[in-house]
Amino acid sequence: MKKLTSMVLTIGLGSALLLAGCGSTDSKVSDGVNKMLETTDELSKAIDSGDQAKVKEVGPTLEDQWSSFEDDVKKDNKDLYEKIEKYLDPTIAGSEAASLDKEALGTLNEQLTDALKELDKKTE
């Protein structure tokens, strides 16, 4: 009887740890996506107002935010990972450009935002 109880407790504890680990990855991705969506919103406002200094300040922060959880996305959602990467790099480059191309950067930022929203829905 003791062996059976020990085995049930061990399995239960192992399952709980496994589930906790899965939840933390989803939570990490969800938190990261939410931060990036806040940043793309802030970037959009800066683009619309033509505030190049703010664009140059905000745009590059996307890379640091993305790098904190991109490996988890790459592992679990390869298609969305590639879609985000497709728009992320040009958005960052456009935000660092010498002159602000509002139309091009605005479009890239919208496409990045849409890809992030898609990932957000998938991780709910």
Language-model features and meaning:
Residues 1-11:
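Bacterial N-terminal signal peptides that target proteins for export
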Residues 18-21:
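C-terminal motif of bacterial Sec signal peptides marking the signal peptidase cleavage site
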Residues 23-124:
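Mature extracytoplasmic or organellar-lumen-exposed domains after removal of signal/transit peptides
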